[in-house]
Amino acid sequence: GRVLSAAAVGFLYGWSGSRRHLPWINIGIAGHRERDVGELIIANKIIEQSSRRTWYPPQVVATENGSTLITADQIERDFEQNAAYDMEASGFLAAALRCSTAELVQSIKIVSDNIRQPLTSLNADRIEQLIGGQLNTIAHLADRLQQLSQSNLPELDVEHLMTELTRRWSFSVTQRHRLQRLLQRWVLLL
């Protein structure tokens, strides 16, 4: 659940070259007391049930599909609160917030079961069907996050920076080469 989700974020962050300002989306299924099976929700409040830690992901897309999402350690069947229940969002969020800005970290869930339609047999095909039914909405949010991530990145051009710095200070040829390599690395880290 949440521990494996956090580990996956760490792995993917390292695999991506530890680039900051990238969007992170947790897509999965969740049970909900009242929402219809197949309905998409965007977490606007995430509660880790075991610790009561709470996060409020910034909402970057106007939607009526917002919901509280409770991360439980075991499958929830009683739905005590009118909220969505999953098993990994809090781990994902806690880890992803170390890799990017809060507005670029979102959790999207597709309702898999509720009080009227309890979870009986869930398999990979059914999960694929539930998520597949919401791909257009998921793609819209992903596009919006990608746009936001681009607007968060400072417009850094190594040549422009080199020109500005060498205009202000004197550098030897060796120092210029070192400076250019350092600027290239710095821009990649952002």
What spans do the regions from the language model cover?
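Glycine-rich phosphate- or other oxyanion-binding loops that anchor nucleotides, phosphorylated ligands
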Residues: G1-L189
